[in-house]
């Protein structure tokens, strides 16, 4: 076979889709969209270099593989990279050549960043390729569905209702609250939490606008938030209602219903799970953070299943969810995702 390499051209995506067929992994589904015309990064679009490999037959080049490397404003310390080669052209050095060319292009990135990262699924050709070329895992991520009633509901203290006898009617009403996704208080804790769990790949300094756009804007599908607060106190004793709300201990942002895996057994999937992003105030100690997340998760999954992303860096969420996975009260949806890097 005679392989030639060139810049990505408009229309290559349609040709390659015919050659590649459907995506083999969720990572392929996600990153195929990053294959696009190269950009110098000067017109408001990220810097990008995209290269196509053609199999030349009788003087006609047929695209069979492509690779891309590009900058991102979020997590700017590494460049994202993606390579895909047609099944019948693998193990012929095409992927290795594309990676070498992309590394050379990365040296010209305006940011000066040259480290690469990619997402792979363990046990796949992509994971084996990454390992062979020195890209090692720096994070593991799983999608987990927590079944209804998996966690015991928290018990909140009875409340003094307007100076009358304590009763259970409003127990927890000053601790568990709905919050608008546009809330500045919510935006602040979400941004700081996201930064705290990404010490392995810093997101950089996140502005209020960036946090809103990433997690809380209507375009993300966010349609509600629930927070668990610190029990408020009153300077005038228990008989007087406190004038200020307690600070946020944990939060959950809910999104549009997650799509079910078409390859999974319908009876096993059951009711549709609500997609949620669960986190906590980063300043909490590990035990308090785990307790806060566990209590909030028990409320979220009281009657309906919820789906959440569980990264290995999310210590408090792991403390709540991993025992549920072991006991069968939660299940993993799909395969692990590994972020690999130089």
What do the predicted segments below correspond to?
Residues 1-39, 54, 155-206:
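Short amphipathic alpha-helix that is part of the acyltransferase structural core
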Residues 11-68, 201-240:
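Active-site rim helix/loop that mediates acceptor-substrate recognition in acyltransferases
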Residues 63, 71-83, 90, 247-248, ...:
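A conserved beta-turn-beta hairpin within the catalytic core of GNAT-like acetyltransferases
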Residues 85, 91-107, 132, 283-302:
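Conserved acetyl-CoA-binding loop-helix of GNAT-fold acetyltransferases
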Residues 96, 104, 108-114, 118-141, ...:
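Conserved active-site alpha-helix within GNAT-family acetyltransferase domains
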């Amino acid at each position: 076979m005679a392989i030639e390499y060139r810049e990505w051209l408009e229309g290559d995506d349609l040709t390659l889709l015919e050659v590649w067929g459907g995506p083999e992994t969720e990572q392929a589904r996600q990153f195929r969209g990053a294959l696009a015309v190269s950009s110098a990064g000067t017109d408001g679009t990220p810097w990008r270099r995209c290269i196509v490999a053609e199999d030349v037959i009788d003087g006609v080049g047929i695209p069979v593989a492509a690779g891309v490397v590009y900058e991102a404003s979020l997590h700017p310390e590494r460049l994202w990279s993606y390579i895909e080669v047609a099944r019948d052209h693998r193990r012929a050095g095409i992927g290795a050549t594309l990676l070498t060319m992309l590394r050379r292009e990365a040296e010209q990135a305006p940011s000066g960043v040259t480290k690469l990262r990619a997402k792979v699924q363990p046990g796949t050709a992509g994971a084996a390729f990454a390992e062979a070329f020195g890209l090692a895992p720096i994070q593991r991520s799983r999608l987990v569905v927590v079944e209804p009633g998996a966690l015991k509901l928290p018990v909140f203290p009875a409340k003094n209702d307007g100076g009358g006898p304590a009763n259970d009617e409003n127990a927890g009403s000053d601790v568990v609250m709905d919050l608008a996704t546009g809330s500045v208080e919510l935006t602040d804790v979400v941004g700081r939490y996201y930064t705290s769990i990404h010490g392995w790949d810093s997101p950089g300094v996140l502005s209020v606008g960036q946090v809103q756009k990433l997690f809380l804007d209507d375009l993300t599908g966010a349609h509600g938030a629930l927070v668990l607060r610190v029990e408020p106190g009153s300077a005038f004793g228990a008989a007087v209602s406190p004038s200020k709300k307690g600070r946020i201990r944990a939060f959950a942002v809910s999104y549009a219903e997650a799509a079910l895996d078409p390859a999974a057994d319908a009876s096993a999937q059951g009711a549709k799970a609500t997609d949620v992003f669960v986190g906590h105030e980063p300043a909490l100690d590990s035990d308090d953070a785990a307790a806060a997340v566990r209590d909030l998760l028990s409320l979220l999954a009281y009657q309906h299943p919820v789906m959440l992303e569980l990264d290995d860096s999310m210590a408090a969420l792991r403390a709540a969810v991993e025992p549920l996975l072991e006991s069968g009260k939660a299940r993993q949806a799909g395969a692990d995702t590994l972020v690999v890097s130089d």
